[in-house]
């Protein structure tokens, strides 16, 4: 079975079994919704168990969640630095033009049919996502995911076409 990362437990929150999660999904409200099931993976990326979300709220940059049946800090302390993942069959269908992170990471980025590099990571600093493009012999390129920059995405071809605005790439 394939699983996809949705977050990392970074700490406990209070004494009532809540955990701080650093989310790595565009769909935090959906993933951490009460009643949803996620898979818990340990620090060595080994499956531990399925967990059901009992509660979720957002505080600053963290998602605060609680697992059903685990209502005290003693029950959840051991999960620090564990990962939360969603099973592939639990992924919902997306609208046309929407993509999951795992579909974008690894795509090659081209400008005017010239290969710039490969998307290695997606950041969520604010209003829009920023794609981190790993380039050979150059620093990583931070590419905002906005229409004037990203011209087209072809998952089947493993390709993203972009137009880099003047000043965005300081190594040109």
Swiss-Prot record:
GO molecular function: ribosome binding
Residues of the PRC barrel domain: 96-168
Domain of life: Bacteria
GO cellular component terms, A-Z: cytoplasm; ribosome
Keyword set, alphabetical order: Chaperone, Cytoplasm, Ribosome biogenesis, rRNA processing
Subcellular location field: Cytoplasm
Keyword Phosphoprotein in record: no
Gene Ontology biological process: ribosomal small subunit biogenesis; rRNA processing
Family: Belongs to the RimM family.
Main function: An accessory protein needed during the final step in the assembly of 30S ribosomal subunit, possibly for assembly of the head region. Essential for efficient processing of 16S rRNA. May be needed both before and after RbfA during the maturation of 16S rRNA. It has affinity for free ribosomal 30S subunits but not for 70S ribosomes.
NCBIfam families in UniProt: 16S_RimM
Quaternary structure and interacting proteins, as annotated: Binds ribosomal protein uS19.
Domain remark text: The PRC barrel domain binds ribosomal protein uS19.
Protein name (Swiss-Prot/TrEMBL): Ribosome maturation factor RimM
Gene giving rise to this polypeptide: rimM
């Amino acid at each position: 079975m394939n699983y996809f990362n949705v977050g990392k437990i970074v700490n406990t929150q209070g004494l009532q079994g809540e955990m701080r999660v650093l989310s790595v999904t565009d769909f935090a409200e959906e993933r951490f919704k009460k009643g949803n099931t996620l898979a818990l993976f340990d620090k060595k990326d080994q499956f531990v168990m399925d967990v059901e979300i009992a509660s979720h709220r957002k505080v600053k940059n963290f998602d605060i969640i609680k697992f059903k049946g685990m209502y005290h800090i003693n029950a959840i302390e051991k999960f620090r630095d564990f990962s939360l993942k969603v099973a592939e069959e639990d992924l919902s269908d997306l609208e046309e033009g929407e993509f999951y992170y795992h579909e974008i990471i690894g795509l090659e980025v081209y400008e005017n049919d010239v290969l710039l590099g490969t998307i290695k990571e997606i950041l969520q600093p604010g209003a829009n996502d920023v794609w981190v493009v790993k380039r050979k012999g150059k620093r990583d390129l931070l590419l905002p995911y906005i229409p004037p920059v990203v011209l087209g995405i072809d998952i089947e071809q493993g390709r993203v076409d972009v137009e880099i605005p003047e000043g965005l790439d300081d190594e040109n």
